[in-house]
Amino acid sequence: AICSLVLYLLTLMLMEKLSSNTVDAQEVELIWTILPAIVLILLALPSLQILYMMDEIDEPDLTLKAIGHQWYWTYEYTDFKDLSFDSYMVPTSELPSGHFRLLEVDHRVVVPMESPIRVIITAGDVLHSWAVPTLGVKTDAIPGRLNQTSFITTRPGIFYGQCSEICGANHSYMPIVVESTPLTHFENWSSLLSASSSL
């Protein structure tokens, strides 16, 4: 709409149908200011509604709580009774051959693929940020506040991330590993972990 108006006025000016009095007039300046403002408002209102609707998952298949600490993550599967664990980076001296240095953890976050997952994120001490770029997720972890994000994995695989908020001396030693598996594998994993934590 704006481009069409500009081209129309440019054509009128080139054909000399607009006099210098019209071009320099306050009415034209007022139109040049108000019309783009109205167009921007008409674009912004639906965009904001869509932005908020995209962030909400009404009924996720799984809710996961991630708590940032200096310098590890705690995960709680809130849909299960006793399913929680701490996830620390595997030191380079203990890293198995073929694994990524500074990215591998002792306990991965396992999620079922093709299921909407809600992650509730907070921190226990200082600011952190739960970021997994390949899933398009980055959410700040703030002490005393619950932030949420969501994602759906469409294929099995391992997705790596990091704390992306400088949180102290060992900030770069807070990797995040999300493992996406078929639902049956996830159910087997969760029942094994629940059984071992209840011992």
Swiss-Prot record:
One of its GO terms (biological process) is ATP synthesis coupled electron transport. GO terms for cellular component: mitochondrial inner membrane; respiratory chain complex IV. InterPro entries: CcO_II, CcO_II-like_C, CcO_II_C, Copper_CuA, Cupredoxin, Cyt_c_oxidase_su2, Cyt_c_oxidase_su2_TM_dom, Cyt_c_oxidase_su2_TM_sf. GO terms for molecular function: copper ion binding; cytochrome-c oxidase activity. Its main location: mitochondrion. Residues 14-26 are mitochondrial matrix. Cu cation A1 binds at residues 128, 163, 167, 174. The chain crosses the membrane at residues 1-13, 27-54. SUPFAM superfamilies: Cupredoxins, Cytochrome c oxidase subunit II-like, transmembrane region. Its EC number is 7.1.1.9. It is a multi-pass membrane protein. It holds the Pfam family COX2_TM. Its cofactor is Cu cation. Cu cation A2 binds at residues 163, 165, 167, 171. It catalyses: 4 Fe(II)-[cytochrome c] + O2 + 8 H(+)(in) = 4 Fe(III)-[cytochrome c] + 2 H2O + 4 H(+)(out). Keywords: Copper, Electron transport, Magnesium, Membrane, Metal-binding, Mitochondrion, Mitochondrion inner membrane, Respiratory chain, Translocase, Transmembrane, Transmembrane helix, Transport. Binds a dinuclear copper A center per subunit. The keyword Glycoprotein does not apply. It is found in: Mitochondrion inner membrane. Component of the cytochrome c oxidase, the last enzyme in the mitochondrial electron transport chain which drives oxidative phosphorylation. The respiratory chain contains 3 multisubunit complexes succinate dehydrogenase (complex II, CII), ubiquinol-cytochrome c oxidoreductase (cytochrome b-c1 complex, complex III, CIII) and cytochrome c oxidase (complex IV, CIV), that cooperate to transfer electrons derived from NADH and succinate to molecular oxygen, creating an electrochemical gradient over the inner membrane that drives transmembrane transport and the ATP synthase. Belongs to the cytochrome c oxidase subunit 2 family. Component of the cytochrome c oxidase (complex IV, CIV), a multisubunit enzyme composed of 14 subunits. The complex is composed of a catalytic core of 3 subunits MT-CO1, MT-CO2 and MT-CO3, encoded in the mitochondrial DNA, and 11 supernumerary subunits COX4I, COX5A, COX5B, COX6A, COX6B, COX6C, COX7A, COX7B, COX7C, COX8 and NDUFA4, which are encoded in the nuclear genome. This is Cytochrome c oxidase subunit 2.
